[in-house]
Amino acid sequence: MSHENERLVIIRHAPYSSNALREGLDVALVAAAFGQTVSLLFLGQGVLALLKEQKTGAPGQKATLPTIDMLEMYDIDQLLVPQSALDALHLQVDQLVEGATVVADAGLPELLHRHSQVMNF
């Protein structure tokens, strides 16, 4: 059952590969500022946005790690990563920012169903 005003933002793009990551984070921040419950699910290359040791992008591109770090101030504390995404990128959870939570792939359908709004970036 989905809950009203619960939004799941799915991030699929790596930092600096396009504007999709930044746009997804902006949507999450705006929704949270208006009192919606927001969870972030990082899939595929999107998991790279959660790396502690993130490199900077090309000149003129804003770093995404400061935005990730301030999500908690907006009560966005669900930073979810499927185990398969970590495995595919040969990453361990300790390489990710504090607060990232590994979820079982089997639980993803229920996670999607639980949110009234799902947005992909």
Regions inferred by a protein language model and the residue ranges of each:
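Short acidic-hydrophobic, aromatic-tinged amphipathic segments that line or gate anion-handling sites
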Residues: G99-A106
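Structural alpha-helical scaffold elements that stabilize or flank donor/cofactor-binding regions
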Residues: L111-L112
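A glycine-rich helix N-cap at a beta->alpha junction
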Residues: G57-D87
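Histidine-anchored nucleotide/phosphate-binding helix
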Residues: L21-L40
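Short connector loops at secondary-structure junctions
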Residues: L41-L50
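Short, glycine-rich nucleotide/cofactor-binding loops
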Residues: L8-R22, Q54-K55, P59
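An anion/phosphate-binding loop that grips the pyrophosphate of nucleotide cofactors and donors
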Residues: H115
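Residues at the starts of beta-strands that form the adenosine-phosphate
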Residues: E6, T37-S39, Q78
